[in-house]
């Protein structure tokens, strides 16, 4: 097991090989303690071995690593000098650049390949890693040692790791856990880590990027980074940890160390290489930003993240953009590059959640971001790790809701499998389909977008559309643009952190339709995954916008939020504020999608419910229910017409807020445009305009119409029942039996068939067409004719059942006359 000594890093599995033509042992021999310097360079072969003990990072190394991280301001500087001085010092800088600029070290070709070929590594052993330790370490060490036997894909991975190390050092140079950035990519080889750290230090000092952000956890490997804000705990990567520690110490503390001028002189001696590195890094960053919109990697055993986690990610991105210094504009997109390429498994155990929360709190505390740091720390206690996520293929199949600003979200919102709720309130979510009082058939029709059969009037049809819209978000045909409001939620989060309001204050995070009041007395915090999820946002916003124009026109939205958290009447106005988040463009687009007939009905219905807005509501429910009711406190049964009251009463009174919310789709959209013009003075300053809702609404209306237009089942053609078919009452299957029964029935004999010689069993088909038609009816073959029946009669010739009487047409004879034949006098006809 490798351990960190006070003076240098010692590893037992090394053999003193040269790294890229640079003998680290001879450079470090100048230090006072040269014990074990030949062991600084681990073998390249051991890097790709999954059973290497260096790669199995256990809990026993965490104490020594954390203690080394705590010595950052003290004796750790001496450890830094041991490694960084030979890598970046004045004596060996030419040697290092010579090793970089050799012809066989084709970094330009590697970077160009990386810019054109997208590298995706599927994790095999550890689900918490994006790029596994084995892959990256073996490839990076092989590139340094000029190993030509490795494949081109591995070379691309090594360039990926080199560029990511550079970007990581720039992105994470402002916090105490910054040394985890270079260790985040899991290099098991100290040689590969040293080269990556040297390249990162060169790029970082040349650009003089001194930005501070608090995002190193998004770049952490997850395999060994369990020390809360301490030193890097990656396996065998202590050399890179020391280099990163030195670099972070110089950048974070702002104190120039002795080796910083040597970086600059080394760069001045080799300007061409530095220029290549800079241009390629920038090209890769631009290319990755383009590729991020179309790439859907497959990560094993991953679920959709919490919406709060994605909001936290957007908050991190905005913090980075705000804290970029002016001289760091060259690498302004480096942190975004790491955001895009980072994924983590969100199936976290409670122990991992606790560790990551402690780690994030330590990082936010050490970042020193002023007043926002306290809000971040308070917010971390409510949410798990903020992880940038791309829409994974697994999420497309499993149906988790994704709100990512980089992608359109082609996922469906199912209420069956949610990730663990970040609120940790112990209140379980309730499926909206199971909370209503409607019959099962109506629920199924509502899920399919079909109106119930009982909707006779236009108002009843509106209630049916409400139920359909309430349950449509559980289906699989939702339009990709339905899940919006990401930028609005990120701005909302910034305001929340300044006033200390948690994210689930707004209810469901993507819709802006939640009405819970976490600060109220006796009200448990509702989970962020509400049943009134995604389609209710346009409905809720238009309804509240129309009410805003009539009731709270003089209020300012921020002023409302700060004063209305203690009384039940004020909680209703908080619900209105959550509904005000939609812009006028969306309201007008929603208004254009509704028919003129619905608009006339809605204008009549809009006049009564608003007068009761600030008074007691007969159907408003307290907010201590397991799920919130953003609309139940605002709309009475008079909102829906009297004909639909019976259909909607059971739903509203049973606290299914999704149905009540969707009912306002037809009840409030007509007055939305006029109310928007009237409420211009109280326009919310939080929500910006997002993409159009008209496209989404037309999609949903087309979906509902398509579900209604089902083809009718074709009816079976009725058979002509010219005669009664008594022959079907028995179990007759053969034609000769059928003819024998006809001969014994007075209805058919002698009308269609008759005996010519009863003793000999000779009979004649009087009406061959009628007999064949009767036989076809018996066999359920309406196209039966005499030719077809005649072939069956000829078949009986060979069987010895019937015989053809010569010289007479349509005359046949039974070979063996049955004795139990009913005697019918047919000779008189």
From Swiss-Prot:
Ranges of compositional bias, category Gly residues: 224-237, 509-522
Give GO terms: molecular function aspect only.
Answer: DNA-binding transcription activator activity, RNA polymerase II-specific; DNA-binding transcription factor activity, RNA polymerase II-specific; sequence-specific DNA binding
Task: Please give the superkingdom of this protein's source.
Answer: Eukaryota
The Gene Ontology biological process annotation of the record reads: autophagic cell death; autophagy; cell differentiation; oogenesis; positive regulation of transcription by RNA polymerase II; regulation of development, heterochronic; regulation of transcription by RNA polymerase II
Induction statement: The expression of this protein is developmentally regulated and is correlated with the 20-OH-ecdysone induced activity of puff 74EF.
Which residue intervals are the DNA-binding region? Answer: 733-815
Query: What does the entry list under GO cellular component?
Result: nucleus
Q: Does the keyword DNA-binding apply?
A: yes
Give the record's keywords alphabetically: Developmental protein, DNA-binding, Nucleus, Transcription, Transcription regulation
- Bias class Basic residues marks the residues at 618-634
Location of region: Disordered: 214-237, 301-329, 353-383, 396-443, 508-533, 558-641
Localization, per the record, is: Nucleus
Q: What is this protein called?
A: Ecdysone-induced protein 74EF isoform A
């Amino acid at each position: 097991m490798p351990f960190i000594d006070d003076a240098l890093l010692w590893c037992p599995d090394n053999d003193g090989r040269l790294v890229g033509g640079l003998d680290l042992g001879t450079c470090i021999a100048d230090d006072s303690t040269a014990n074990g310097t030949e062991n600084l360079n681990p073998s390249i072969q051991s890097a790709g071995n999954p059973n290497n003990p260096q790669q199995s990072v256990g809990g026993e190394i965490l104490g020594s690593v954390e203690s080394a991280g705590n010595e950052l301001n003290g004796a750790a500087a001496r450890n830094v000098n041991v490694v960084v001085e030979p890598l970046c010092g004045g004596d060996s800088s030419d040697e290092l650049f010579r090793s970089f600029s050799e012809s066989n070290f084709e970094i330009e070709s590697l970077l160009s390949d990386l810019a054109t070929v997208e590298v995706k590594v599927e994790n095999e052993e550890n689900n918490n890693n994006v790029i596994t330790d084995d892959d990256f370490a073996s490839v990076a060490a092989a590139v340094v040692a000029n190993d030509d036997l490795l494949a081109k894909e591995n070379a691309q991975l090594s360039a990926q790791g080199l560029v990511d190390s550079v970007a990581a050092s720039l992105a994470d140079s402002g916090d105490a856990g910054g040394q985890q950035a270079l260790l985040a990519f899991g290099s098991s080889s100290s040689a590969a880590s040293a080269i990556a750290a040297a390249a990162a230090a060169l790029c970082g000092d040349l650009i003089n990027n001194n930005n501070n952000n608090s995002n190193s956890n998004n770049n952490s490997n997850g395999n060994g980074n369990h020390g809360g804000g301490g030193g890097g705990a990656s396996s065998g990567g202590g050399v890179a940890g020391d280099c990163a520690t030195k670099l972070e110490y110089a950048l974070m503390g702002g104190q120039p160390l002795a080796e910083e001028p040597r970086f600059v002189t080394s760069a001045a001696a080799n300007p061409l290489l530095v220029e290549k590195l800079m241009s390629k890094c920038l090209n890769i960053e631009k290319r990755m930003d383009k590729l991020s919109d179309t790439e859907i990697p497959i990560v094993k055993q991953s679920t959709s993240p919490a919406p709060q986690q994605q909001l936290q990610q957007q908050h991190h991105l905005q913090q980075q953009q705000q804290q970029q210094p002016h001289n760091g504009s060259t690498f302004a997109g480096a942190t975004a590059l790491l955001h895009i390429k980072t994924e983590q498994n969100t199936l976290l155990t409670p122990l991992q959640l606790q560790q990551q929360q402690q780690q994030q709190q330590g990082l936010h505390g050490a970042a020193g971001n002023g007043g926002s740091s306290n809000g971040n720390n308070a917010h971390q206690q409510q949410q798990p790790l903020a992880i940038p996520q791309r829409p994974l293929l697994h999420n497309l199949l499993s149906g988790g809701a994704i709100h990512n600003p980089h992608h359109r979200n082609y996922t469906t919102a199912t209420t069956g499998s949610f990730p663990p709720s970040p609120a940790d309130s112990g209140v379980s979510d309730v499926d909206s389909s199971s909370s209503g009082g409607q019959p099962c058939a109506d629920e199924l029709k509502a899920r399919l977008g079909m109106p119930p059969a009982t909707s006779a009037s236009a108002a009843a049809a509106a209630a049916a559309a409400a139920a359909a819209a309430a349950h449509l978000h559980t289906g699989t045909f939702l339009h990709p643009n339905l899940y919006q409001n990401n930028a609005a939620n990120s701005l909302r989060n910034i305001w929340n952190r300044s006033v200390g309001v948690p994210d689930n204050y707004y209810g469901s995070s993507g819709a802006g339709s939640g009405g819970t009041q976490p600060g109220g007395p006796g009200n448990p915090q509702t989970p962020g995954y509400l049943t009134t999820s995604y389609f209710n946002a346009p409905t809720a916003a238009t309804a509240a916008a129309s009410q805003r124009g009539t009731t709270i026109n003089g209020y300012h939205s921020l002023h409302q939020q700060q004063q209305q958290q203690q009384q039940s009447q004020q909680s209703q106005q908080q619900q209105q504020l959550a509904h005000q988040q939609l812009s006028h463009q969306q309201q007008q687009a929603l208004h254009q999608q509704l028919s003129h007939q619905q608009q006339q009905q809605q204008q009549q219905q809009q006049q009564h419910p608003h007068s009761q807005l600030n008074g007691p509501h007969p159907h408003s429910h307290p907010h201590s229910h397991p799920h919130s009711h953003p609309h139940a406190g605002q709309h009475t049964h008079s909102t829906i017409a009297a004909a639909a009251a019976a259909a909607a009463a059971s739903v509203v009174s049973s606290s299914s807020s999704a149905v009540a919310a969707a009912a306002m789709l037809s009840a409030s959209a007509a007055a939305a445009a006029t109310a928007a013009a009237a409420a211009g003075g109280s326009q919310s300053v939080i929500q910006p305009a997002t993409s159009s809702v008209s496209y989404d609404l037309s999609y949903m209306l087309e979906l509902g119409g398509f579900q209604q237009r089902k083809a009718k089942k074709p009816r079976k053609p009725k058979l002509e029942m010219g005669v009664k078919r008594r022959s079907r009452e028995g179990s007759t299957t053969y034609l000769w039996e059928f003819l024998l029964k006809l001969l014994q029935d007075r209805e058919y004999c002698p009308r269609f068939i008759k005996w010519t010689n009863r003793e000999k069993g000779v009979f004649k088909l009087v009406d061959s067409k009628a007999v064949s038609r009767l036989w076809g009816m018996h066999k359920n073959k309406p196209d039966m004719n005499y030719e077809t029946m005649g072939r069956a009669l000829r078949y009986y010739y060979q069987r010895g059942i019937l015989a053809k009487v010569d010289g007479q047409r349509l005359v046949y004879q039974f070979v063996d006359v049955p004795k139990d034949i009913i005697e019918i006098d047919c000779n008189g006809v």
